[in-house]
From Swiss-Prot:
It holds the Pfam family Complex1_49kDa. It comes from Methylobacterium radiotolerans (strain ATCC 27329 / DSM 1819 / JCM 2831 / NBRC 15690 / NCIMB 10815 / 0-1). Its EC number is 7.1.1.-. The keyword Membrane applies. This is NADH-quinone oxidoreductase subunit D. Signal peptide: none annotated. The gene is nuoD. It is an enzyme of class 7 (translocase). It is a peripheral membrane protein.
Amino acid sequence: MTEHNIRNFAINFGPQHPAAHGVLRLVLELDGEVVERVDPHIGLLHRGTEKLIEYKTYLQATPYFDRLDYVSPMNQEHAFCLAIEKLAGIEVPRRAQLIRVLFCEIGRLLSHLLNVTTQAMDVGALTPPLWGFEEREKLMIFYERASGARLHANYFRPGGVHQDLPPKLIDDIDAFCDPFLQVVQDLDDLVMANRIFKQRNVDIGIVSVDEAMQWGFSGVMVRGSGIPWDLRKAQPYECYEEMEFDVPVGKNGDTYDRQVIRMEEMRQSVRIMKQCVAKLREPAGQGPIASVDGKFAPPPRREMKRSMEALIHHFKLYTEGFHVPEGEVYAAVEAPKGEFGVYLVSDGTNKPYRCKIRAPGFAHLQAMDWMCRGHLLADVSCVLGTLDIVFGEVDR
């Protein structure tokens, strides 16, 4: 009998692969069709964000957060603003809190629509992305009408938001909600009930409760395994404790469960949006949209054009910026991808001493090797799609 020396086959997956979701490069070690090892190579989109923030004032550093998870930009700004507000003890007016929560939920819809439909495309369905992008376009227009930008909004500011929402926009967001629920139902029927989609996703990339905790997962990745952990319920920030919504939880911890949870989260987000719209219309929802403390919130532009004092005030805040008391703080939000945290260290000057960004996608990608081991090559794109990775935040 002759001895055969069997050597595993190594291939590159990405960074120009349509299912790589950006600039991911995976070096796969294959034994036939079976994946033996996955080696993610990251850093192709590294821009040194954390270091750049140290050279900018707090107000100038906010736009960097739009460029992390650029699929749902406002959710990242939120964490940074919360960190500054905790350190400086800034009181955020109620109307600003409602607007923030409303746009964070719009961001969640933007992210989940992209993820669920592109993951369906990765396994061979062509219709869902077209439907999903049609709805995303409407939501992008809401972003544009609120902040003037479709993508990099720079709308959340320390102490509140940049400008108020016009009443017509609030009406249009209200009118968007119910028809959107029908689209979610159509997507559910088309994708989640599809036999082929189930065959490709059920029992793939299973994560148990203990494993989810050990890997440091958050967001949908832990909820898919059956842990009802959602920062909006567990550690409510802004006005989330007033909102009524459910936290969907999976039971098998596979890629199919995680996608079903994302579909249900979209319905819950619409519930929160409707409550925000109703509260914004009430008399209690009227009032200022930024902190009334002039040390932190610049005057509105229309006032700046009329008053010399407002112009000086505006100029001072945008050039020198405000000084934040010495200290360190961690602020986290339930971003669409998971727990997005900002660890901010202040030395009492007008610039952050250190700003550590805890990106959920980074923690999820490290488990790629462990999740894919023993699966077939075709399952790699299913697992990758369900991790919901955007490289802006992984590479920072």
